Amino acid sequence: MTETNFDFLAQGDPAIAAIIGRELQRQQEHLELIASENFASPAVMAAQGSVLTNKYAEGLPSKRYYGGCEFVDQAEELAIERAKELFGAAHANVQPHSGAQANFAVFLTLLQPGDTFLGMDLSHGGHLTHGSPVNVSGKWFNAGHYGVNRETERLDYDAIRELALQHRPKLIICGYSAYPRTIDFAKFREIADEVGAYLLADMAHIAGLVAAGLHPSPIPHCDVVTTTTHKTLRGPRGGLILTRDAELGKKLDKSVFPGTQGGPLEHVIAAKAVAFGEALRPEFKTYSAQVIANAQALARQLQARGLKIVSDGTDNHLLLVDLRSIGMTGKVADLLVSDVNITANKNTVPFDPESPFVTSGIRLGTAAMTTRGFKEAEFAIVADIIADRLLNPEDSSMEDSCRRRVLELCQRFPLYPHLSPATPVAV
């Protein structure tokens, strides 16, 4: 949002303007370590806040149910072509409102109610839409689950194969929300072929790394690939479906509209196009490589301070801290770091004895603060701040020191310096 938009908003709705101003200040003065968050560019935000929000456009480009779509058609076509180029896909649907919507459209295309599919257990790093009993994927379908090896805390492909042979699923899902290691999509393809299953990769967390060529691509191996467009892709919040099979792509299109959605959000689709264009530039690969280097630096320094990292490290943008060794829950750790302006999230760890509302771990990600310019040296400092806070939870002077160091880092690497509330905002 530009200053001009702030001015309009301050005049039209001072209450909302004040709330947004406070949120801006929160983002500027906090270390954002939630692995699923990032900071979109001003260009992405400008597209999303444009006049395209006014246009209804049910259908696909050149096949709309409304008139006046010639320019939103151009924007959506550009988003489609950029997505295909970015990921090497034959077909792209840019209309899903979210990753969850994208996944549901795939289920509608490939499965019937009661069919069996196989996905990772949520407590091991899977996602709600991969068969959790509280999600439609777990209510309408027969969901089987695999996990990680207890000793290595990594995927055990032999065990996954055995489960696939046992369940004979119609669909296998790979791609996760809290798995810090490289995924062998080719191995999953072998398993899927052996049992005659479709293979879906949900690469929501690693899409930016895949786009940059820093994680193996699922496109050559999977029947369908879904992703969000924020996270490591650094775009607007939304979803995307990709496939190398153009004919399957036509069926997926029908499952998005009219199957699961009505009108697409053309202002968001334009913002997706901007983000895809940014990701096609050479500097995006440099950024993505720094994201991984920063995550590894963060993990190393946390380990040096005596904290346990699930799977003993990371290959991507996220890591899980297992807090059982220091006798702390994820819920408590989340609150402790929040007190010193660090935003993270409690998270289950493999074979976690605690409930999802308590957990034994916290999940940390480096994508957002890398966008702000952090490198390995800064993330080593971040690791020390986190360790100081978690290892000294009752020390008020240490709490003050941690908060001060966080604010110093934030001031060194400003976020959206061109943005400021139109009117003073009390915090």
From Swiss-Prot:
GO terms for cellular component: cytosol. Its cofactor is pyridoxal 5'-phosphate. Keywords: Amino-acid biosynthesis, Cytoplasm, One-carbon metabolism, Pyridoxal phosphate, Transferase. Its EC number is 2.1.2.1. It holds the Pfam family SHMT. The record marks H230 as: Plays an important role in substrate specificity. It is found in: Cytoplasm. It catalyses: (6R)-5,10-methylene-5,6,7,8-tetrahydrofolate + glycine + H2O = (6S)-5,6,7,8-tetrahydrofolate + L-serine. Catalyzes the reversible interconversion of serine and glycine with tetrahydrofolate (THF) serving as the one-carbon carrier. This reaction serves as the major source of one-carbon groups required for the biosynthesis of purines, thymidylate, methionine, and other important biomolecules. Also exhibits THF-independent aldolase activity toward beta-hydroxyamino acids, producing glycine and aldehydes, via a retro-aldol mechanism. This is Serine hydroxymethyltransferase. The gene is glyA.
